[in-house]
Amino acid sequence: MLVWLAEHLVKYYSGFNVFSYLTFRAIVSLLTALFISLWMGPRMIAHLQKLSFGQVVRNDGPESHFSKRGTPTMGGIMILTAIVISVLLWAYPSNPYVWCVLVVLVGYGIIGFVDDYRKVVRKDTKGLIARWKYFWMSVIALGVAFALYLAGKDTPATQLVVPFFKDVMPQLGLFYILLAYFVIVGTGNAVNLTDGLDGLAIMPTVFVAGGFALVAWATGNMNFASYLHIPYLRHAGELVIVCTAIVGAGLGFLWFNTYPAQVFMGDVGSLALGGALGIIAVLLRQEFLLVIMGGVFVVETLSVILQVGSFKLRGQRIFRMAPIHHHYELKGWPEPRVIVRFWIISLMLVLIGLATLKVR
């Protein structure tokens, strides 16, 4: 919005031209989202406490989690608010990629909100019925994927970028829709599963979003895209603004979510952020890169799949508890140790993922 306004005012004062620079808008997008999160935090926490919107803790979970019962949840609302406001202020409003991310972000946020509401207000520990949750997540993912396929059919926008190989970028055809669907829905659920300890999900999300900000900048720059042998996508540059907004909002939320947490993001935050990372990866044609950079989310999800599969097939569990972060808790690791070590692993994976862009 401000970019559009600046374009009309630049003829009166040349200083408004600074709004056309992507790097400037990326920085102020991050700062805007950060300050909104920091401003909303105390107010959101107080309001959630007043409404008695406290975390519901499973009785079969680690004993250390019982003290978390009643901690305000649904704090993801402040993350989403900060991201949406920042993006609307600093991104070009005509960019279709920006709107794709916002549709998934807000859509998944609404699904998460309904799930949280049923858990917190109606005291239903199961929340939104699983089949309805997946149904609406699928509707949003398939709708966006189909629209993107029609808009980018037989162009670089529907190619598959394979790491470590320079010119291996096959056209996916209709498989693009299927891949996009699984990436968006899968990442949404993966971040949701990871959100089990104070700050555990938000910091890897910040790292991955920061990594994608660099990838989006390169993908939207013809020279750098050619240099790195990745598809040049002219709309991709504005995703830098979205990614930095996620970074800023995430850091602002972490201020209140760090151990011991004053507020939890809830499904309204985790589903939305996961879905956003998924659609960003799809738009940038970097689904494989998401698997590498988001390795913490992948391992958390695989631990649940393996645990359930092993118990059904063999009657035995692989881990003491899944997702895997609970396994380490039950082994006696203090919660802060689990969190920080997962953060370190996440940062390493993001750096490795970025390195693969050059190793071709």
Curated annotation (Swiss-Prot):
<feature type="topological domain" description="Periplasmic">
    <location>
        <position position="93"/>
    </location>
</feature>
<feature type="transmembrane region" description="Helical">
    <location>
        <begin position="132"/>
        <end position="152"/>
    </location>
</feature>
<feature type="topological domain" description="Periplasmic">
    <location>
        <begin position="359"/>
        <end position="360"/>
    </location>
</feature>
<dbReference type="InterPro" id="IPR000715">
    <property type="entry name" value="Glycosyl_transferase_4"/>
</dbReference>
<keyword id="KW-0132">Cell division</keyword>
<keyword id="KW-1133">Transmembrane helix</keyword>
<feature type="topological domain" description="Cytoplasmic">
    <location>
        <begin position="189"/>
        <end position="198"/>
    </location>
</feature>
<keyword id="KW-0131">Cell cycle</keyword>
<feature type="topological domain" description="Cytoplasmic">
    <location>
        <begin position="309"/>
        <end position="337"/>
    </location>
</feature>
<feature type="topological domain" description="Periplasmic">
    <location>
        <begin position="153"/>
        <end position="167"/>
    </location>
</feature>
<dbReference type="GO" id="GO:0008360">
    <property type="term" value="P:regulation of cell shape"/>
</dbReference>
<dbReference type="GO" id="GO:0005886">
    <property type="term" value="C:plasma membrane"/>
</dbReference>
<comment type="similarity">
    <text>Belongs to the glycosyltransferase 4 family. MraY subfamily.</text>
</comment>
<feature type="topological domain" description="Cytoplasmic">
    <location>
        <begin position="47"/>
        <end position="71"/>
    </location>
</feature>
<dbReference type="InterPro" id="IPR003524">
    <property type="entry name" value="PNAcMuramoyl-5peptid_Trfase"/>
</dbReference>
<comment type="pathway">
    <text>Cell wall biogenesis; peptidoglycan biosynthesis.</text>
</comment>
<dbReference type="GO" id="GO:0009252">
    <property type="term" value="P:peptidoglycan biosynthetic process"/>
</dbReference>
<feature type="topological domain" description="Periplasmic">
    <location>
        <begin position="1"/>
        <end position="25"/>
    </location>
</feature>
<dbReference type="InterPro" id="IPR018480">
    <property type="entry name" value="PNAcMuramoyl-5peptid_Trfase_CS"/>
</dbReference>
<keyword id="KW-0460">Magnesium</keyword>
<feature type="transmembrane region" description="Helical">
    <location>
        <begin position="94"/>
        <end position="114"/>
    </location>
</feature>
<feature type="transmembrane region" description="Helical">
    <location>
        <begin position="168"/>
        <end position="188"/>
    </location>
</feature>
<dbReference type="GO" id="GO:0071555">
    <property type="term" value="P:cell wall organization"/>
</dbReference>
<dbReference type="Pfam" id="PF00953">
    <property type="entry name" value="Glycos_transf_4"/>
</dbReference>
<feature type="transmembrane region" description="Helical">
    <location>
        <begin position="72"/>
        <end position="92"/>
    </location>
</feature>
<keyword id="KW-1003">Cell membrane</keyword>
<feature type="transmembrane region" description="Helical">
    <location>
        <begin position="288"/>
        <end position="308"/>
    </location>
</feature>
<keyword id="KW-0133">Cell shape</keyword>
<keyword id="KW-0997">Cell inner membrane</keyword>
<feature type="topological domain" description="Periplasmic">
    <location>
        <begin position="284"/>
        <end position="287"/>
    </location>
</feature>
<keyword id="KW-0472">Membrane</keyword>
<feature type="transmembrane region" description="Helical">
    <location>
        <begin position="338"/>
        <end position="358"/>
    </location>
</feature>
<keyword id="KW-0961">Cell wall biogenesis/degradation</keyword>
<keyword id="KW-0573">Peptidoglycan synthesis</keyword>
<dbReference type="GO" id="GO:0051992">
    <property type="term" value="F:UDP-N-acetylmuramoyl-L-alanyl-D-glutamyl-meso-2,6-diaminopimelyl-D-alanyl-D-alanine:undecaprenyl-phosphate transferase activity"/>
</dbReference>
<dbReference type="GO" id="GO:0051301">
    <property type="term" value="P:cell division"/>
</dbReference>
<comment type="function">
    <text>Catalyzes the initial step of the lipid cycle reactions in the biosynthesis of the cell wall peptidoglycan: transfers peptidoglycan precursor phospho-MurNAc-pentapeptide from UDP-MurNAc-pentapeptide onto the lipid carrier undecaprenyl phosphate, yielding undecaprenyl-pyrophosphoryl-MurNAc-pentapeptide, known as lipid I.</text>
</comment>
<dbReference type="GO" id="GO:0008963">
    <property type="term" value="F:phospho-N-acetylmuramoyl-pentapeptide-transferase activity"/>
</dbReference>
<feature type="transmembrane region" description="Helical">
    <location>
        <begin position="26"/>
        <end position="46"/>
    </location>
</feature>
<feature type="transmembrane region" description="Helical">
    <location>
        <begin position="199"/>
        <end position="219"/>
    </location>
</feature>
<keyword id="KW-0808">Transferase</keyword>
<dbReference type="GO" id="GO:0046872">
    <property type="term" value="F:metal ion binding"/>
</dbReference>
